[in-house]
A protein has these predicted regions:
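Low-complexity or membrane-interfacial segments used for flexible interactions
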Residues: 1-44, 48-49, 107, 114-196
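Acidic, polar low-complexity intrinsically disordered regions
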Residues: 33-127
């Protein structure tokens, strides 16, 4: 499996790229453990393209599944978040890779077979925004807040295939989950120091 690169290296870069595809990512109102992925404009009760499950227990902490994610045959990929390490273990369609996470910046980077190293970079002003950059610093995708409560919007800014979308979804939500875990751990340490 390789990434779709046909138009990736075309000339005509823009300082303000427009989305090639936009996805609405919202918590499922009837299931607090699921996050649903739809193309932007679809109602929350329509069948999702993907569902994301985030768990603090178990072997896989972030799981991306096709549709509602009814069984193991629907699983696209999963991420195992570290307890005492900076390496997030990703598996997508059976292919393992490691994503390196920086607690100082909240950024993470991971290798891809055909695009080199990609990096999720948190906005320095808001942890609600993050950009996916390639090695040259070109923005490939971005995640930002949507209009509805709890909604995130994923904009993919380059021509892509389904595999690239799945890599983006898994790596983005693994990074978000690890940032949340690191923030909670920092809060506990500060609380322990102040309480002592």
């Amino acid at each position: 499996m390789t990434f779709h690169l046909s138009s990736l290296f075309s000339s005509g870069g823009s300082s303000n790229p427009q989305a090639c595809a936009s996805f609405s990512i919202r918590p499922a109102p009837w299931d607090g453990t699921k996050i649903l992925v739809h193309q932007t404009g679809y109602p929350i009760d329509s069948p999702p393209m993907y569902s994301i499950t985030i768990s603090s227990s178990g072997k896989s902490n972030v799981v991306v599944s096709r549709g509602w994610g009814g069984g193991p045959w629907d699983v696209v990929g999963d991420a195992r978040l570290p307890t005492f390490s900076s390496k997030i273990h990703l598996t997508i369609h059976g292919q393992p890779t490691e994503m390196r996470f920086s607690e100082m910046s909240g950024n993470s980077s991971f290798p891809t077979p055909s695009m080199g190293k990609l990096k999720w970079k948190l906005d320095s002003m808001s942890t609600k925004k993050m950009d996916l950059l390639d090695e040259s610093g070109r923005k490939l995708a971005k995640v930002h807040s949507g209009k509805a409560s709890g909604e995130k919007i994923l904009d993919i800014l380059i021509p892509h295939d389904i595999f690239f979308l799945e890599v983006v979804l898994l790596s983005a939500w693994a990074n978000k989950a690890q940032n949340k875990t690191a923030l909670e751990a920092s809060g506990e340490v500060i609380g322990a120091v102040l309480g002592a």
